Amino acid sequence: MAVLIGLLFWFCAAARHGLLQSNAYDLGLFDQWAWLIGQGQPPISSMEQVHVLADHGAWMLYAAGAAYSVMPSVQWLLSSQAFTLSFTALPIWWLAQQAGLTPRRCWLMCGLWWLQPVVFNTNLFDFHPETWVMPLFALALWAERAERPRVWLLLLLLLLGSRDGLVLIVGGMAIDLAWRRRWRWSATAAGLSITWLLMLSRWLYPLLRNGEGPKAAGRMFSHLSGGPLQAIQSLDWGGGLLYIVLLCLPCIGLWRKRSLPTLMIGAPLLLVNLLSASPSYRTLIHHYSLPLAVVMVVAVIDARPQQIRAIRGFSWTLGWAVVCWLALAKPWYFSGPYLSRVSALNDAQEAISQVQDTDAVLTTSYLVPQISQRSRVAFPKKGSLRNLDNSGWNVLLLNPNDPGWGSTKRLQKNLLSEVQQRGWLCENWPSKLELCRKK
């Protein structure tokens, strides 16, 4: 079943990418980094001018670089993400077995995972390396309960190697362990998360960012820099409450008092999402809440003592999960929003065929992932690019009628007018896509 669902996830993600709905952030970004690693070049993004390790400390991306050295393809990222999300059900099954649930109830726990809206939506939303370690996160919970300290510690190290933000999950595990009076385990998890955070913020990030610390922290929490009253007023109370309700909706009816320690694992990450200045942290569309889905399903497992023979309302439980998935997941995007560029597919393919591997290309955000396996590629961000003086770009592939995320019609029109005045060779298509090459 996990294989079939993994194939379905991969098909959906690949279809979205093929329909020109993926973006520079983040599929194009990670695709370029993986390609640069595979080519033996410095993995510094031409879009962000940032080393791969200075982004989120995700050293596990070097594994993708090894795959790219054999055969460079964005499908490495999409397929690995799809299958790791699907196969997270395996350690969830083991956790359910460990708790004494019957095989039928173990299947129900797997179904609850597969039907988490944030799981499906994360699979669709480009690529993010923390998806690789969701099986390891669930397995780490199993290893702790099975008294496997070495396995547990190794899994935590791998967890941290996919994204710096997962220090919040490891810190949450320390809280859970302290609640259960497992003091040595708690101290180990807390020490590991604090050490990793300090190593990144005080050494690695400044080393690779010319003395600067983590880029996301300033953006996420700058609104909290005033007094307490100002900070309270700046919080998104309504959006935060709705986010919590929608996030918990598939599982909340299955939690019991016994679930509370497990739910504490997600508390630090949930708090950061609520405090963030960006509303995207408080949606089920993005990947920021993905680890919380693991926590919520494991909390359902922990709600049931081993002596319980059956979970009441098996069909109702599964049916409710399906209803929540249909309401909050985004499969229906394939019947509408994801079809918005179908008429431009042939034009885009023809234009891309004229782009050479060595070209430095400035294009729309949704075309970046189609051509990101090169040393220089980016999209014209609004407010950051006024002209092409000393920019080094030799190809523009833009569509002012559909400028894509982060750009504007006016900016792209101005850039095209500028290169036409400079005598670049330009070709356009019926969809208003225009390719200009420097002579």
List PLM regions with ranges.
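Signature aromatic-anchored transmembrane alpha helix within multi-pass, membrane-resident enzymes
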Residues: 2-3, 104, 190-194, 305-330
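Extracytosolic helix-loop segments that constitute the early lumenal/periplasmic catalytic or substrate-binding loops
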Residues: 11, 29-52, 59-60, 144
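Membrane-lumen/periplasm interface segments of specific transmembrane helices
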Residues: 12, 22, 26, 183-268, ...
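Transmembrane-helix motifs of polytopic, lipid-linked glycan transferases
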Residues: 75-100, 120, 139
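Membrane-interface transmembrane helices that cradle and orient dolichyl/undecaprenyl
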Residues: 98-100, 129-132, 137-151, 178
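Short helix- or helix-capping micro-motifs
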Residues: 106-117, 156, 160
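Short acidic/glycine- and proline-prone juxtamembrane loop motifs at membrane-interface regions
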Residues: 122-130
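Hydrophobic/aromatic-rich transmembrane helices and adjacent perimembrane loops
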Residues: 263-308
